């Protein structure tokens, strides 16, 4: 059993880990001071590519093309880049025990890693139907998407079941993006989800109606208000049918499940303060344990502009929280401080020829503006959310770069709105004036 010691350890191999490593390199680290420990076999990469370009039938994205930090226009950190920057990249290494009081991590093979400062960037893991005891959920070709190995399995299944039937369980981010890319791969696609409309945590019924009709026009079948209650398999163990709770049965060659995720915090249970399902941090991503920071999906942090604490699962926050934590660590070493994290919630998605962005908070009353006809070749519409007479959230489908910047400005500024009717009339021009 080997033992290694580092000044800093980043635990994780996703977006936050890559961006934290980049920020350490920017701030300056000595060779041998920093290690990144990941259970994955590849250097940190931009996870959003997995549900988009990685699955395209032509011109598919492949590593090293989307290693961190190309997603934000930054430097691509190849495996050799870490070495050049004096960072030890420790891959295919699963940490099974963390002792925060002893400042040590233990791997599945018994190796011990000591640290002075730890950044927890373990991210999330998908919720699996086997977790809920769904009958037959362990059949072959029932797939999930979180890591590059999952994406490789899906690519192989798409090739093997060319033109076959795919059932997508879940109507959120992953469900929508995967339904689109499976359809682009010419599979027969059916989406199944229990909610009354897709993306219910963000979309209003009006916004969802546009996307559901657009998807239907593209040949995606949508079944709402029910769940997958069981699966039957062929003699070779591959999934054959999906039983729905409402009594219907769907044929399936591939099933892709996207029913949510949970933060990977179990290593730290009982050692660190938690809140809202994540590890509680301050505005610098410091946890309740000295010299331990948590970033990305696992962090429950103060959302300053709303006077609230939240946990955010999105690539934008994963990048920015990682950078904030490292800046805070390095500033403190020099007896200085950085400004508190003041995050503006931001979400986006791309599917088919569509592209939307959302900034702010989706609370209060909402109004739709623009052309939301899903039959139009280039639909362009948006929405505002108004609470207490102020615009608190803004959404746009098909917006230009300048229009999307205007959305961010209006959500940050939270200007007063005379009336909902006036917002409908002004549309994106209201945001452009801020």
Swiss-Prot record:
Which Pfam families does UniProt cross-reference here? MDHAR3-like_C (PF21791), Pyr_redox_2 (PF07992)
EC top class, as a word: oxidoreductase
Q: Which residues are NADP(+)-binding?
A: 173-177, 201, 260, 313-314, 348
Q: What induces it?
A: Induced by cadmium.
- Principal place of residence: other
Gene Ontology molecular-function annotations: monodehydroascorbate reductase (NADH) activity
**Record field: catalytic activity:** 2 monodehydro-L-ascorbate radical + NADH + H(+) = 2 L-ascorbate + NAD(+)
Record's protein name: Monodehydroascorbate reductase 1, peroxisomal
